Amino acid sequence: MSDKVKGKKQEEKDQSLRVQILVYRCMGIDLWSPTMANDRPWLTFVTMGPLFLFMVPMFLAAHEYITQVSLLSDTLGSTFASMLTLVKFLLFCYHRKEFVGLIYHIRAILAKEIEVWPDAREIIEVENQSDQMLSLTYTRCFGLAGIFAALKPFVGIILSSIRGDEIHLELPHNGVYPYDLQVVMFYVPTYLWNVMASYSAVTMALCVDSLLFFFTYNVCAIFKIAKHRMIHLPAVGGKEELEGLVQVLLLHQKGLQIADHIADKYRPLIFLQFFLSALQICFIGFQVADLFPNPQSLYFIAFVGSLLIALFIYSKCGENIKSASLDFGNGLYETNWTDFSPPTKRALLIAAMRAQRPCQMKGYFFEASMATFSTIVRSAVSYIMMLRSFNA
């Protein structure tokens, strides 16, 4: 039986990766395959093509509005979001074979642990449920932001009609085009282009981010299983006792290697996610403060909310891996180490020294942690106030 068939059968059984499989299918990508053999490339082209082309009018708009803080902040918020999505798409394409291989590798490790220690199933199920709940919440928040973006122009039209003002056709995202957008025959296809670009930006971001959730929660499951096996390690003495300890330490080592591998592949993305999200929160937060309580501010509120949630979840994933890796060290002290034989105690001492060094997900200058999240939010609020003073 092929790895792909095994993976699909196991997915049907434990119901993990459901959200990830769905969002990747929406982009025409088969997450179970390390190649494009089972993809629908036409769907990927139809979704990502408009987003790549959409960067041109947005860059032109950023240049056009360079002296207008309000319009520039609106334009740059969308531009940075699109740029980040394109980076995520290219990152997945470049590392696809490794990511898919890592999925099978993690699932094989966990399946083997269930055979060795049946109680591991409960830990794995809890972590996968948390992953799916987080991925589903994340999907809903980003979907809501996309819906608000599509509806934003109609809110302006309705308000203009109620006030009796002249109707001015607007787009979900600012851009500069070589034709008059007030002409309906030009406006409609451009609006659809904007909506398709929004769909691509939201869905591709969900693909790569939700896959990170799967990796982090399952690595945490490996660390937790290693901790519980360590706590319940019997003090039987002799070679059998030492062999049992070695098996647990090997499992912990696998978790460390996978965590380091994930951190290495996601390092550029973590850096851009934190850096660009901080800039986006500044610019879009300025729009919220400038427009509130205008109904059009609902879109920007949803946008800022999705940015904060994305930043929070990245920080939470990094914090979870860090805590789980350190928690394994606590498990070493909860064992019956006083009853172990001298060779086992010596091995346990070395393991305790290594467990003091946590796994960290870093994006060069940024560590994915709750402390970094708090710092960015506090700094963003200060910059929003500064932008408001420029616009006063």
Swiss-Prot record:
Tissue occurrence: Expressed in olfactory sensory neurons in the antenna.
Residue stretches spanning the membrane: 42-62, 75-95, 142-162, 203-223, 269-289, 298-318, 363-383
UniProt keyword Transmembrane, yes or no: yes
Cytoplasmic side stretches: 1-41, 96-141, 224-268, 319-362
Cellular compartment(s): Cell membrane
BP GO annotations: detection of chemical stimulus involved in sensory perception of smell; signal transduction
Membrane disposition: Multi-pass membrane protein
Location (main, coarse): membrane
Subunit architecture: Interacts with Orco. Complexes exist early in the endomembrane system in olfactory sensory neurons (OSNs), coupling these complexes to the conserved ciliary trafficking pathway.
Function in brief: Odorant receptor which mediates acceptance or avoidance behavior, depending on its substrates. The odorant receptor repertoire encodes a large collection of odor stimuli that vary widely in identity, intensity, and duration. May form a complex with Orco to form odorant-sensing units, providing sensitive and prolonged odorant signaling and calcium permeability.
Family: Belongs to the insect chemoreceptor superfamily. Heteromeric odorant receptor channel (TC 1.A.69) family. Or1a subfamily.
PANTHER family: ODORANT RECEPTOR, ODORANT RECEPTOR 47A-RELATED
The protein's name in its UniProt record: Odorant receptor 9a
Recorded name of the encoding gene: Or9a
